[in-house]
Regions:
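Glycine-rich beta-strand-turn "strand-cap" elements at beta-sheet edges
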Residues: 1-4, 8-10, 38-49, 75-100
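Short hydrophobic/aromatic beta-strand micro-patches
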Residues: 10, 54-56
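Short, surface-exposed ligand-recognition loops at beta-strand->loop->(often short) alpha-helix junctions
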Residues: 10-23
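Residues that cap or initiate secondary-structure elements
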Residues: 13-15, 61, 95
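Intrinsically disordered, low-complexity segments enriched in polar/charged residues with Gly/Pro
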Residues: 16-17, 27-30, 42-43
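Short acidic, gly/pro-rich beta-turn/loop elements at beta-sheet edges
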Residues: 17-19, 52, 63-65, 99
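An amphipathic, aromatic/His-enriched active-site/gating alpha helix that lines ligand/cofactor pockets
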Residues: 25-38, 56-90
Length: 100
């Protein structure tokens, strides 16, 4: 069963695009090095400063291991001064997926 990592950030005013750019680069780079990462979506709402990454992994173990990767720690260090609250990370079962 695939698993989804949802990683949500509350961005400080004036830093929305900075966080979007950092998140997009991290997702691109991580997708290139992790064969277990199936897809990534970065979504956001500029008005509220919410930025959320949704990554689909081929196993729960792969989804959990992201926290141990140096590239993830580097990303967290880069966004830390730009966010107003600690990131919220959850791992969910992927129940159904449709795409065209």
């Amino acid at each position: 069963m695939s698993h989804v990592v949802e990683f949500t950030l509350e961005v400080k005013p004036g830093h929305y695009q900075d966080v979007v750019d950092l998140y997009s680069q991290f997702a691109h780079d991580y997708m290139a090095i992790d064969p277990h990462l199936i897809s990534v979506h970065i979504v956001g709402e500029p008005g509220t400063g919410l930025v959320r990454g949704i990554g689909v992994f081929d196993s729960q173990e792969a989804a959990q291991e992201v926290n141990s990767d140096v590239i993830f720690a580097t990303f967290n260090d880069a966004i830390e001064p730009l966010i107003s609250a600690p990131p919220n990370r959850v791992i969910l079962d992927l129940l159904h997926a449709w795409s065209r």
